Regions:
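Glycine-rich ATP-binding loops of the HATPase_c
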Residues: 128-135
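Detector for a conserved hydrophobic position within an alpha-helical segment of the HATPase_c
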Residues: 123-124
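Conserved catalytic submotifs in the C-terminal HATPase_c
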Residues: 16-21, 42-52, 88, 101
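Short conserved segments within the C-terminal catalytic ATPase subdomain
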Residues: 36-45, 81
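Glycine-rich/acidic phosphate-handling loop/turn and adjacent ATP-lid/helix
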Residues: 93-118
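A conserved beta-strand-to-alpha-helix junction within the catalytic ATP-binding
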Residues: 16-31, 62
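Conserved micro-motifs of the catalytic ATP-binding
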Residues: 10-15, 53-56
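Short beta-strand/loop element within the Bergerat-fold HATPase_c
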Residues: 80-92, 99-100
Length: 150
């Protein structure tokens, strides 16, 4: 994680870019999160990506989004996370909102959490997207990101 952060900061990260159908990727994401969290994260995913395609390093993109959905430290407590993803044809991007994200939860404040947040920010910025964390409120901690479509 620290190495990824250093490479992103220096603009030295190597990417294996390919096209990815966002709706298909979303279908796989839910299973991946279930497996990696061993059932502790219950992901409620609303995806309306239509035929959106992104050009990205799909492994790193998946890693960044997984970091937003999974606990940044060892934790088996059940947690409901809600992710809404939509294709914005006018802006030519996908936009995503993740409510109750463990990565943005102050409970897990640590150097590792900071590094993961910074890495996500730099990754999305590198590909002309956005990444921001909203202060905790009644929905918990919310992360927003956008990523340009092809």
């Amino acid at each position: 994680n620290v190495l990824d952060l250093s490479r992103l900061e220096a603009n030295m990260m190597k990417f294996q870019l390919q096209d990815c159908n966002v709706q298909e990727w979303c279908s796989e994401l839910a299973c991946l999160i279930q497996m990696r969290s061993e059932g502790s994260i219950h992901l409620e995913l609303e995806a309306d990506a239509g035929d959106a395609t992104i050009h990205t390093d799909i492994n790193r993109f998946t890693q960044m989004v997984s970091n937003m959905l999974l606990y940044p430290i060892e934790c088996k407590k059940r947690r409901d996370v809600k992710m809404k993803l939509a294709y914005n044809t006018e802006a030519q991007n996908i936009s995503c909102q993740i409510a109750n994200s463990p990565l943005a939860d102050p409970t897990f404040s640590s150097q590792k959490q900071f590094i993961l947040q910074k890495t996500c920010h730099l990754f999305f910025e590198h590909f002309n997207g956005t990444f921001r964390i909203e202060e905790p409120n009644e929905r918990g901690s919310v992360i927003y990101f956008t990523y340009p479509t092809k």
